Amino acid sequence: MTKRALISVSDKSGIIDFAKELKNLGWDIISTGGTKVALDDAGVETIAIDDVTGFPEMMDGRVKTLHPNIHGGLLARRDADSHLQAAKDNNIELIDLVVVNLYPFKETILRPDVTYDLAVENIDIGGPSMLRSAAKNHASVTVVVDSADYATVLGELADASQTTFKTRQRLAAKAFRHTAAYDALIAEYFTAQVGEAKPEKLTITYDLKQAMRYGENPQQDADFYQKALPTDYSIASAKQLNGKELSFNNIRDADAAIRIIRDFKDSPTVVALKHMNPCGIGQADDIETAWDYAYEADPVSIFGGIVVLNREVDAATAEKMHPIFLEIIIAPSYSEEALAILTNKKKNLRILELPFDAQAASEVEAEYTGVVGGLLVQNQDVVAENPSDWQVVTDRQPTEQEATALEFAWKAIKYVKSNGIIITNDHMTLGLGAGQTNRVGSVKIAIEQAKDHLDGAVLASDAFFPFADNIEEIAAAGIKAIIQPGGSVRDQESIDAANKHGLTMIFTGVRHFRH
C-alpha cells in the first residue's frame, strides 16, 4: 500500500527538497493552499486536500483540514482491527506522515502595525489539530514540526521504509511542545489584551537560547532560555562582539548590572558588579571619569567582575579598562578604536552591545523566582520616586551636597543584597555592606570598607533601622547624613540618636529589599 504524507507549512525552508525525496521513495503527498502551489510549481505532484475531504476550503481558509477523512487517517490505530474496519467502511485512507508548521502568530504580533483582527486571523486551528492527532498516534504516524528533522526522517525512510519508534516518540514530544508553546503565546497575548493581572493559569513560553556547560556550580546542569517574545534590552538579546560564551553566573551577574544602570540615565555612569552586588558605581560628566570613579570605589573587587557603561566606550576609557581582568563589558556602543583596544590579546573578554534606548520596555516585565514546588511572580522594583516626597525627620536639613549624595546613594542601595548598606559621596560608591543577617553588621562592613574616604560621605539603608545602635555606629564613623525608608516601631529612637549627634536623616517611605 502506498504511504501518504500530509504537508502544510508556513515556513517552506527545505520543503521542496524534502517532498521531492518523499516522491522518490514512492510516497503520495496531500497538501493545502500555498504549500500545494509551491510544491506544484516545483514539479512535485500533490493531492489537493479537498480531494481527500470532499469539501472545498471555506471561510477564507478557516476550514480546510478539520474533517474525519483527515483526522481519521491520522488517529486510526494500525493494531486495532475495529479502527481499520471503521476507516474502510468510511472510505478513510491512512496518513503516515504529517509535516506541519503553524500560522506565524508570533511574527504577526511582533509587527509594529499589527491589529487585533490580524492577530486573531493568524491563530492556527487546523494545524495544531493535525499535529496533536499525529503525535497522539505516534505508534504509527511520524509528525514533523521542524525542518531540522527532515534529514533524519528521510534517512530512516530510505533505510527501512519507516521511521523508528524512538524517532516517532521524540518527534511527538517535540510536536506537543510546539503546540503547547504556540497556545501559550496566544494565551499570553489575550491575557495582555484584557488586562488580566492575576490569571488563574500562568502560561509563558521560552525558546532554548544556549545549552550551557554547567550551572552555578560544575555539578549542576543548566540551559539558557529566551522569552518567545524577546526583550530588546536584555542579556538574551545582547549582541556579543567578542569573547567566550556566557556562563550561567555571567548571565545572572550581567542581568543584575543592566538593571542597576537603568536608574542612572541622566549622567554618564559606570557600574562594576561582582556576585550580583555592585562593587563600584561612578557618575561624572564624561564616561572616562565615571570609569575612574567606579574603579577607584573598589579596585580589588572589580577583578574578574562585570562592567556596564551607559555611554559609548571611547578609546581613552578602553585604554584604562584594558589592563584590568574583566569577565564582561556591556555598553550601548563602542568606537572602532575602543573595540580594537579592548580585544587586543583579550580573546576571552566578553563584550556585549545593548540598545539602551529600549530600557523602559524592559522595566514592565514580571520577575519569576522558582521555589520548590512553585513559582513566585512579582513586578520589578522600579517604582518612581520623587525626592520632593521624602521627609527630613531630623532637626538638621541636608546641605545641597548631601542632598545630591543621598539621591545617588538611594539609587545605588536598591541593588545591594539585603541587609544592604551603602556609603557614597555625590559621584561614587565608597563602601558596601551586603547580605548580612543583621543590619548593624552590614553597617560595620560598609564603614570598614569606606574608612579612608568618609569625609562628606552619606549612608543609605535598604530598609529601616530596627534599633538606634546603627545610628551610633554611623555617627562614630563621622558620617553626617543618612537615607532610609523608615517604618520601624522604634523610628523615634533612631531620630533622637541622629539629632543627638547632629546628623541629618531622610525617610523615603519606600523599602528596597533584595534577596
Curated annotation (Swiss-Prot):
The keyword tRNA-binding does not apply. InterPro entries: AICAR_Tfase_dup_dom_sf, Cytidine_deaminase-like, MGS-like_dom, MGS-like_dom_sf, PurH-like. GO terms for molecular function: IMP cyclohydrolase activity; phosphoribosylaminoimidazolecarboxamide formyltransferase activity. Pfam families: AICARFT_IMPCHas, MGS. Keywords: Hydrolase, Multifunctional enzyme, Purine biosynthesis, Transferase. GO terms for biological process: 'de novo' IMP biosynthetic process. Its EC number is 2.1.2.3, 3.5.4.10. Residues 1-145 form the MGS-like domain. Pathway: Purine metabolism; IMP biosynthesis via de novo pathway; 5-formamido-1-(5-phospho-D-ribosyl)imidazole-4-carboxamide from 5-amino-1-(5-phospho-D-ribosyl)imidazole-4-carboxamide (10-formyl THF route): step 1/1; Purine metabolism; IMP biosynthesis via de novo pathway; IMP from 5-formamido-1-(5-phospho-D-ribosyl)imidazole-4-carboxamide: step 1/1. It catalyses: (6R)-10-formyltetrahydrofolate + 5-amino-1-(5-phospho-beta-D-ribosyl)imidazole-4-carboxamide = 5-formamido-1-(5-phospho-D-ribosyl)imidazole-4-carboxamide + (6S)-5,6,7,8-tetrahydrofolate; IMP + H2O = 5-formamido-1-(5-phospho-D-ribosyl)imidazole-4-carboxamide. It comes from the Bacteria. The keyword Cell cycle does not apply. GO terms for cellular component: cytosol. Belongs to the PurH family. The IMP cyclohydrolase activity resides in the N-terminal region. This is Bifunctional purine biosynthesis protein PurH. It comes from Streptococcus agalactiae serotype V (strain ATCC BAA-611 / 2603 V/R). The lineage of its organism: Bacteria, Bacillati, Bacillota, Bacilli, Lactobacillales. The gene is purH.
